[in-house]
Amino acid sequence: MAKVIGIDLGTSNSAAAVVMGGKPTIIPAAEGATVGGKAFPSVVAFSKDGDLLVGEPARRQAVTNPENTIMAAKRKMGSEHIFKAGGKDYKPQQISSFILQKIKKDAEAFVGEPVGQAVITVPAYFDDNQRQATKDAGTIAGLDVVRIINEPTAASLAFGLDKSKQDMKILVFDFGGGTLDVTVMEMGGGVFEVMSTSGDTQLGGTDMDKAIIDYIVDDFRKREGVDLSQDSTALTRVREAAEKAKIELSTVMETDVNLPFISHDSSGPKNLELRLTRAKLEELVGPIIDRCRPSIEKALADAKVSPSDIAKIVMVGGPTRMPAVKKFVSSVTGKESESGVDPMEAVAMGAAIQAGIIAGDVTSDIVLLDVTPLTLGIDTLGGVREPLIERNTTIPTSKSKVFTTAVDNQTAVTIHVVQGERPMTSDNVSLGSFNLTDLPPAPRGIPQIEVKFDIDANGIINVTAKDLGTQKEAKITIESSSKLSKDEIEKLREDAEKFSDEDEKKKGKVELKNEAESFVYTAEKLINHDLKDKITQEQGIKISDGIREVKEALDQDPDILRPKLDSLKAMVNEITTEMYQQAAAQGAAGGAAGGAAGGAAGGAAGDAAGAAGDSTGDAAGAAGGPSEGPAGDAGAGESAGPEPGDDGQPKPGPAA
């Protein structure tokens, strides 16, 4: 049987795990860990030759290819947004599928056998459109998504594996790159029950990065008179530096942001040099952290518990490593957070545990009881939303309600399904609609039409409408505007497989070209800036000729490019080594100058490569605002007059 893996499909970075020997184990990427400690940056790019790059290779080249690099596609899941890259259009599902395909491939290399199924996590506040889009992405990537579970639930599962016999209530504070989820759970006797969930799909580490970026850009504008926000390449470098500084300041009190040659004007090149302290960082991100408070308070209120009832606080997501975030959560709840769960790995490990239970690799009596995060209902006469399944209802679940016709001799009704907390239909998220037709003509209020909602363990919704008089029925699985048809999914899956084959063939060539371009940048910087006054004319000409030969061979086969690149590297190494030895012999003053030259040779390429794992893109999908009170029950007599639906069919009215 093919392995079932658990995947944390994140906004900035993704992670995956698999159960081995009864325990969840993190799956490494082929390239190893990267910025932030996760294996798979959620970055997709297309090279100038049209080659697909995913994960760390895509992140590394983003600084030189920002227009063809896509980040934070998760924030657009469930929407009709189109990404443009490499001269083509891509849906969010496709971009996410490339990431999942990369994870699948590296997982197979790690476990040494095929991986065909997966449990994928989503933010608790993802609506049905976003969940279905995530499932579609898995299908395109060649994965059978056996279950979609909420990220906080997965984290709780990882936390409770060895404590499942204890009765306790825990609060999971899941603060990721793009979303915030706060979940209150009750655990005991192997049962994990979600009591409530609250959150914000437009709040995350990305917003922190933006605050830091804005500060750096503003500081540089004031000092140098240059607006870096107008230069996409420079802004990408600033974004990476901002994320790096944010991570470093979780463990140190200050850090330096150094970006040489970030810009230039008539006076010459300009360097960005800025010292950022933890105090300044906390000042910048303080308002963002404060926006988490309502979600914590709402989750506690919905679960009908006070902070004193909470036994454990579990922190999930990269931003929760920040001392300011830990201090904030502690001040709101009155409790210190647990340290036994790695915030960057907990979600993937929890997903792997659930995958292991499904595959039979984990012997456990664990029962996972999730909830629906938003109220589900239908549109009725007057544009009023009639709720059927209230938010925080444990799933899987089923609920039905009887409605009637709104006008005499009505022969059809339109069932419009919505998700959200607002009393008016138009203020909620539309999930889809369908018609029940061929109803026998009858006075209004006589027909009895049963509308039934079924939600499976993945949170996917099926809706049925039945005329109880004739037993005629119509049903749908919610088809959102962003959901793909089976034919579209199959085509995209074939495209993904095609990309995989091409990527495998061209991988060596692309990596060699990236390596060559990076070293050319280093060599040019050495002879034009760092060592310009320290090398002989003959040495300068020699390196320039080597650079020219490498540039001319960039688009040629590896067997032509590799020797030229190795030759250039040898030349640069010989010259910088010679200069270092001379400087060392001249004493401390000369040694300092030689060290600078050697450091520039070894490190300049690192400044030019890499891209941030976060994006400031808008969040995809919208959660409805809080309800001002439940919709009142109406008798049949209140269904006065026809009011056509979007397709001209009258809407149902509430039954007496």
Curated annotation (Swiss-Prot):
Belongs to the heat shock protein 70 family. GO terms for molecular function: ATP binding; ATP-dependent protein folding chaperone; unfolded protein binding. Gene3D superfamilies: 1.20.1270.10, 3.30.420.40, Actin, Chain A, domain 4, Substrate Binding Domain Of DNAk, Chain A, domain 1. Keywords: ATP-binding, Chaperone, Nucleotide-binding. Residues 606-621 have a biased composition (Low complexity). The gene is dnaK. InterPro entries: ATPase_NBD (IPR043129), Chaperone_DnaK (IPR012725), Heat_shock_70_CS (IPR018181), HSP70_C_sf (IPR029048), HSP70_peptide-bd_sf (IPR029047), Hsp_70_fam (IPR013126). Residues 590-605, 622-635 have a biased composition (Gly residues). It comes from the Archaea. The keyword NAD does not apply. Acts as a chaperone. Residues 590-656 are annotated as: Disordered. It comes from Cenarchaeum symbiosum (strain A). This is Chaperone protein DnaK. The keyword Chaperone applies.
